[in-house]
């Protein structure tokens, strides 16, 4: 076994609603608001697409997901040779890390961001430099100070998980202009569709200026397909050619591909879902207590508090399962009735 695995632990999911009910003696319904899932679910057209192809389950998938690749190519106006799919972004991050990193290499990212950047670097015996957050968000200037000619990968998460904060187009443009052109900069935009900020980066446009800027997106969040695992990277043709060597030949299932195509085609449904999310998100920031909430451009809100366990249990007692972190609690934005319960708790909670 690799010795570096001793530095890591397997992913530990939160307790199930049933287990939480038993642990805390809770009666009534519990709502899972801990994993940033789209509670509205996927487009109805997704279910139609799945039903239409159930007779094909005994076939292997088409390697490389060509139907979905063509759809993404048209949707984003990028060449198909620049797109690579994974079974969720977890696998995409794994493939990139495996293809790029060798023992002793170095990646640079942030503290308090998506853990798979760190996890996969350690698996490959690489070194990890984690720059502290600044005002709850990525400190691009601080990260830039750690990047040099020998850096192997830079990971940026925008908006960031778990804080929900973002950096703007001007900041990313400036950052990319100062990174050595041979150093890959991976921009993880898993929550892109929820963003309403007008100055959010046009990363696809920046890719026209910077060959080392690579973009990650997923169908797990706004498109509501977390259970089907479809994510992708848009990168240079050369990078995709090399990373494709790492990709398992049948990594995205036939059903997942059909579902993702149907979801992508129903942009009206996506707009409805993201609009509902932005309306409900704004309600949290209307509270006087919102000074304790980091500004979010996602479908979740990070609530800062020193009394993490108390807030987690207070929300649990009104039926809402959230995600505790060392410095606060991450809350997935739910339906209005669920948010009403959380808003009442948050409006009466003592944060210090």
Curated annotation (Swiss-Prot):
Its EC number is 2.6.1.9. The keyword Amino-acid biosynthesis applies. Pathway: Amino-acid biosynthesis; L-histidine biosynthesis; L-histidine from 5-phospho-alpha-D-ribose 1-diphosphate: step 7/9. InterPro entries: Aminotrans_II_pyridoxalP_BS, Aminotransferase_I/II_large, HisP_aminotrans, HistidinolP_aminotransfase, PyrdxlP-dep_Trfase, PyrdxlP-dep_Trfase_major, PyrdxlP-dep_Trfase_small. Pfam families: Aminotran_1_2. It catalyses: L-histidinol phosphate + 2-oxoglutarate = 3-(imidazol-4-yl)-2-oxopropyl phosphate + L-glutamate. GO terms for biological process: L-histidine biosynthetic process. Homodimer. GO terms for molecular function: histidinol-phosphate transaminase activity; pyridoxal phosphate binding. The lineage of its organism: Bacteria, Bacillati, Bacillota, Bacilli, Bacillales. Belongs to the class-II pyridoxal-phosphate-dependent aminotransferase family. Histidinol-phosphate aminotransferase subfamily. Its cofactor is pyridoxal 5'-phosphate. Keywords: Amino-acid biosynthesis, Aminotransferase, Histidine biosynthesis, Pyridoxal phosphate, Transferase. HAMAP family: HisC_aminotrans_2 (MF_01023). The modification N6-(pyridoxal phosphate)lysine is found at residue 221. This is Histidinol-phosphate aminotransferase.
């Amino acid at each position: 076994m690799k010795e570096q695995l001793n530095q890591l632990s397997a992913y530990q999911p939160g307790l199930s609603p049933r287990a939480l009910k038993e642990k805390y003696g809770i009666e009534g319904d519990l709502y899972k608001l801990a994993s940033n899932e789209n509670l509205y679910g996927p487009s109805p057209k997704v279910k139609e697409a799945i039903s239409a192809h159930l007779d094909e389950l005994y076939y292997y998938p088409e390697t490389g997901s060509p139907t979905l690749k063509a759809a993404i190519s048209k949707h984003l106006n990028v060449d198909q040779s620049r797109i690579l799919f994974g079974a969720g972004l977890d696998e995409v991050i794994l493939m990139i890390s495996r293809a790029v990193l060798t023992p002793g290499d170095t990646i640079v990212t942030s503290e308090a961001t998506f853990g798979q950047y760190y996890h996969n670097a350690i698996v490959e015996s690489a070194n990890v430099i984690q720059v502290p957050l600044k005002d709850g968000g990525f400190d691009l200037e601080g990260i830039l100070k750690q990047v040099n000619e020998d850096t192997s990968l830079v990971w940026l998460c925008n908006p960031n998980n778990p804080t929900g904060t973002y950096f703007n187009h001007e900041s990313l443009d400036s950052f990319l202009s100062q990174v050595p052109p041979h150093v890959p900069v991976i921009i993880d935009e898993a929550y892109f569709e929820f963003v309403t900020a007008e100055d959010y980066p046009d990363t696809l446009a920046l890719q026209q200026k910077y060959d080392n800027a690579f973009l990650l997106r997923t169908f797990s969040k706004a498109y509501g397909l977390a259970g089907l695992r479809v994510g992708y990277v848009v990168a240079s043709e050369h990078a995709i050619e090399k990373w494709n060597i790492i990709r398992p030949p049948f990594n995205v299932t036939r059903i997942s591909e059909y579902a993702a195509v149907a979801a992508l085609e129903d942009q009206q449904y996506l707009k409805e879902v993201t609009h509902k999310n932005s309306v409900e998100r704004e309600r949290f920031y209307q509270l006087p207590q919102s000074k304790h909430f980091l500004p979010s451009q996602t479908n979740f809100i990070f609530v800062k508090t020193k009394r993490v366990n108390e807030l987690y249990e207070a929300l649990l007692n009104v039926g809402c399962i959230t995600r505790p972190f060392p410095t606060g609690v991450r809350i997935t934005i739910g339906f209005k009735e669920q948010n009403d319960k959380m808003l009442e708790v948050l409006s009466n909670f003592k944060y210090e």
